[in-house]
């Protein structure tokens, strides 16, 4: 006979079996029946605002390679979290997001803190959204949520649970299942792709974030070297999938239709692996591909394959596909290897005042530890980061997968927590714009409370520089609200419990960064910089 217990007890046993023992959230009254008598072998990561909770969990899941559990407060908490939920969805991050629903006896009367149409609210930014019809269905709903979250394309799922369900009687234990989280490509179609690649005179490889997520970094390098092919990063990368200091690396493709087409001119075949075709913004008209250029795409995401504007697609795990391509494609020894990407790295003999972003990155290139990880949300300076701080290892660069800001500060917290969880010691560097730093700023408190080894470098140019750059490109002068005077970023960081300093010179930046690496808490370094036009 199954032992009689409660829905809550059975669910926690299930979560324990699935390895879901870290909960990110901000508790509310409708969630306290779930959180009561919180198990000692679980960890609760308190975020002071729900957008921070989602981004922390997102990065934590990416680094650990395991799904993460997020507990939000009813509809209000979901509303606060939605912006960063969009990023998790686009980034294929397996999150199980939950929130409390009002008591079943009250919900018919639209009570205070009732979550009206709870399963509709997070759509379309979740793979599945469900509210169990019976209390006894809660554990099985979690099992199904887990299975859906990890299966490709991975992504967030949502459960709404009535607050009175947790203490209802139930016979345990829950049924625990395992599911596959990858699938191999169609071998016949992959062979056709391999034949086209082998016949190509001047192929280009475009690697997207799916490659790094699948553990395909080394395989991607091997394929590029066997083909002697130019390698580009897909537009708006949230994960790097190829060493950016490699001689075959040609930089990111760009963002607009015309820019991408121009970059690909001269290639007869473009092989896109683990990326969209393509993530465009802004609209600059042009040909989707140069005349005479063909394209093939390999992705684990059917929606990404269906949305491609050009080319032929193949579904399958990117790493499995690359591993098989290595055996199928012909050696490219007859091809002329592309010229290495130019890296001018020009600096003035006398430092500017205020400093320029390249001057800031030049300092960081000298002093950052080689095994450090970068979280970037300085959107107008990403091109300079690739030039001065290239990503050279798998899992060492993260950025938001959506167009919104407010992900980077809490994501750095999630990375550092994940490193601690898996016993890895490395510095986490958050490269943050001053505008971005004001979103999800509450995450600094969580970082300080956990004494995380994060160094935030905030470039204070007193404006939304990326938006001013778009205004020039899109010919939209006179847009209000693009200047940010009067921000006391360091004072604010100190208020959250971080060590924080303002610097203005390269010498000050170098010294404070070195000091931050030895500090026993999170440090925020605010650097006054010149505005610059972003490379769009």
What is each stretch, according to the model?
Residues 98, 106-114, 255, 261, ...:
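Thiamine diphosphate
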Residues 129, 178-181, 208, 248, ...:
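Conserved short-loop catalytic and cofactor-binding motifs
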Residues 1-6, 136, 160, 172-174, ...:
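Phosphate/pyrophosphate-binding active-site segments
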Residues 7-12, 16-21, 26-29, 34-36, ...:
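Active-site diphosphate/adenylate-binding microenvironment
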Residues 125, 363-372, 493-498:
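A structural motif corresponding to the C-terminal end of an alpha-helix
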Residues 27-28, 99, 163, 235, ...:
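Short, small-residue-rich loop/turn micro-motifs
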Residues 2-329, 370, 425-427, 446, ...:
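N-terminal alpha/beta PP-like core and its mobile active-site loop of ThDP/TPP-dependent enzymes
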């Amino acid at each position: 006979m199954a032992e009689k217990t409660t829905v809550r007890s059975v669910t926690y046993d299930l979560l324990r079996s699935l390895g879901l023992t870290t909960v990110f959230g901000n508790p509310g009254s409708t969630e306290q029946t779930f959180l009561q008598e919180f198990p000692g072998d679980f960890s609760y990561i308190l975020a002071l605002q729900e957008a921070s909770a989602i981004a922390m969990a997102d990065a934590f899941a990416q680094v650990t390679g395991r799904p993460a559990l997020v507990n939000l407060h009813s509809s209000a908490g979901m509303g606060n979290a939605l912006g960063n939920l969009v990023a998790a969805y686009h980034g294929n991050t397996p999150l199980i997001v939950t929130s409390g629903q009002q008591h079943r006896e009250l919900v018919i009367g639209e009570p205070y803190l009732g979550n009206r149409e709870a399963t509709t609210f997070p759509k379309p930014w979740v793979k599945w959204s469900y509210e169990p019809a019976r209390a006894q269905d809660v554990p099985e709903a979690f099992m199904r949520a887990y299975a859906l979250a990890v299966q490709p394309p991975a992504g967030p799922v949502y459960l709404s649970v009535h607050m009175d369900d947790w203490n209802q009687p139930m016979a345990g234990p829950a049924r625990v299942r395992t599911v596959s989280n990858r699938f191999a490509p169609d071998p016949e179609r992959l062979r056709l792709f391999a034949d086209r690649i082998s016949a190509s005179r001047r192929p280009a490889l475009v690697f997207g974030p799916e490659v790094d997520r699948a553990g395909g970094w080394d395989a991607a390098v091997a394929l590029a070297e066997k083909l002697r092919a130019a390698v580009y990063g897909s537009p708006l990368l949230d994960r790097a999938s190829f060493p950016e200091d490699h001689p075959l690396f040609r930089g990111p493709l760009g963002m607009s239709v015309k820019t991408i087409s121009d970059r690909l001119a001269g290639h007869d075949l473009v092989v896109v692996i683990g990326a969209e075709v393509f993530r465009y913004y802004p609209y600059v008209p042009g040909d989707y591909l140069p005349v005479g250029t063909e394209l093939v795409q390999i992705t684990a995401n059917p929606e990404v394959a269906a949305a491609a504007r050009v080319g032929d697609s193949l579904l399958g795990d990117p790493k499995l596909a690359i591993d098989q391509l290595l055996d199928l494609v012909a050696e490219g020894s007859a091809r002329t290897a592309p010229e290495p990407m130019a890296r001018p790295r020009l600096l003035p003999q006398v430092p500017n005042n205020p400093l320029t972003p390249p001057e800031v990155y030049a300092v960081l290139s000298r002093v950052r530890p080689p095994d450090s990880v970068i979280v970037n949300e300085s959107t107008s300076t990403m091109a300079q980061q690739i030039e001065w701080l290239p990503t050279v290892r798998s899992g060492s660069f993260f950025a938001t997968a959506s167009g919104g800001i407010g992900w980077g500060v809490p994501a750095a917290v999630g990375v550092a927590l994940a490193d601690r969880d898996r016993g890895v010691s490395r510095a986490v560097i958050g490269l943050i714009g001053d505008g971005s730093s004001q979103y999800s700023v509450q995450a600094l408190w969580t970082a300080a409370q956990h004494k995380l080894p994060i160094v935030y470098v905030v470039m204070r140019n007193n404006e939304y520089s990326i938006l001013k750059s778009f205004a020039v490109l899109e010919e939209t002068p006179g847009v209000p609200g693009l200047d940010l005077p009067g921000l006391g970023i360091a004072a604010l960081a100190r208020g959250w419990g971080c060590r924080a300093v303002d610097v203005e010179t390269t010498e000050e930046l170098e010294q404070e960064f070195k000091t931050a690496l030895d500090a026993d808490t999170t440090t925020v370094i605010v650097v006054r910089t010149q505005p610059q036009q972003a490379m769009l």
